[in-house]
Amino acid sequence: MEKIMPISPISGHMPLSQIQVPQHATTSPLLEQGNRLFEQSVRRGPLHFQSSSLKHLCAELRQLQNAPSSMQARRVQDAIQHWENHHPKEVMARSTRLAELKQALAEQGTVGRTLQSKVMATGPQVILKQPMPALPQSIAAQITKAQTGCTTTLVSSATAELIKHNQNNQQHIKDSDGRKPVNNMPPPPPPPMADKTQKVKKWVVNTDSKQLQALRYYSAQGYNLINTYLRGGEYVKHQAIETLLSRNYLHSNEPTPQEFDAGMRAYIQDVTEGLNELAITDHKKVYRGLKFDKSELKNLLDQYTTEGNIIAEKGFLSTSPDKAWVNDTILVINLESGHKGRILGDAAHFKGEAEMLFPPESKMLVEKVLNRDDKEFDSHFSNLRLTDDASADTTRIKRIINIKMLNE
C-alpha cells in the first residue's frame, strides 16, 4: 500500500497553492491485520465461516482503509457480530485477531462518527463565507484533523473546496480589503451568481418504513435471535434485550417475561410486514442446502425424508433463487403463483446476495426423496444448480428432496 506522507500544518504566510488535499489517512496496523485475517478466510473458501458475506467484508475493509467511514465501520462491526453469533468455534480460534480488528474499528470508525458530525455541523459552505484571514486557519484545522488518522470524504471535499475558493477569489478579496492589485493587473470579476434553476443537492434521508428497517436489521444480524426464539431454542437473554432496546421494542433493561414476549412479537411482526412490502416475483423454483447428519437432528431429518409429510417452518425460511449451497441435503422447493416468498434485493443489509425469504409458519409438502444410491439420483443431480465455489465438495450431497411450497 502506498504510504502517504503527513501534511505539515500551515504556519506563517505559506501560499495556499502549496497546500495539498489529503487523500487517505494513514492506515491502522490493527486494521491491516484484520484485513489479512479475512483475506485468508476468503482464500480458504466461504465454507470456512459458512457465510458468503465474507467477501463483502473484505471489500468493506479495503474501502475503510482508503477512506474511513462511520457507516462502513458499522457494517463491518455487524458482520463480525454475525460470525460471533453463528460460528463461535471458528471465531474463538481467532479471538485475538478479532479483538484487534474491533480495536482498529474503534480507532477509526468511532472517531470517524465523532469527527463527521462536527464537520457536517460547520460544513464547507459556512467556512467559504468566512473572510480571507480565516481561510488558512480553517484549512489548517481540516488538515490537522485528517492527520489524526480519520480522513473522511467530507473532510477531503471541504478542504478541496476551500483551496479552490481561495485560488479563484484571492485577488477579489484583496481588492475589497483596499489593497492594490497584484502586478498592476485589474482584479478578476466576482464569481458568477449561481443559477437559481439549478437543483440543490440535499443530504440523503432514509425514507424506509419502520418495517423495512426492521427487515434490513434482520438480514444483518437479527435473524439468529428471531429464528432461535421462534423455534424454541436457547438464546442469550441479555443480548436479546439489548437488541430490542436498540430497536425501540423495549423501554426497560429489566422487562417482565410478558413485556419481553410482547417486544419480540412486535419485532417479528415488523419484519414480516417489511417482507410483505417487497415486490412479488414469478420464480418457480428455489434451493436450500441443509446439514442433517447430526444425531440431534434425527427427528428433523425424519420429517423431511417422509414423502407426503407436511412441514410447518416455525421461523423465517431463507432460500436461494439461483444456486444451492453444497451440504448433505439439498432441498429443491417448487413454487406456485401466489407464494409468500420475496427477494430481499436492496432491502438486504449485505448487497449482492440473492436471497428469497419466506415468513414464519410457511408450510411445505415433501413430494419426493432421492438418496445417492437411488437410480434417479444422478439425473436429478446433474440438473441441480449449485454454488460454483471451488472448495465445495459435491460428494457430501447424500440426498435431494423435492418440496412443494403450499400457499396457505
Curated annotation (Swiss-Prot):
Where do the TR mART core domain residues begin and end? 190-393
Q: Where is this region: Disordered?
A: 168-196
Keywords of the record: Glycosyltransferase, NAD, NADP, Nucleotide-binding, Nucleotidyltransferase, Toxin, Transferase, Virulence
Bridged cysteine pairs (disulfide): none
Q: Does the keyword Zinc-finger apply?
A: no
> Could you state one GO cellular component term attached to this entry?
extracellular region
Bias-annotated ranges (Pro residues): 184-193
| SUPFAM superfamilies noted in UniProt | ADP-ribosylation (SSF56399)
InterPro entries xrefs: ADP-ribosyltransferase
Q: Which reaction does it catalyse?
A: L-arginyl-[protein] + NAD(+) = N(omega)-(ADP-D-ribosyl)-L-arginyl-[protein] + nicotinamide + H(+)
Instruction: Provide the E.C. number(s) assigned to this enzyme.
Output: 2.4.2.31
Entry similarity comment: In the C-terminal section; belongs to the SpvB family.
**Name of protein:** Photox toxin
Q: Which organism is it from?
A: Photorhabdus laumondii subsp. laumondii (strain DSM 15139 / CIP 105565 / TT01)
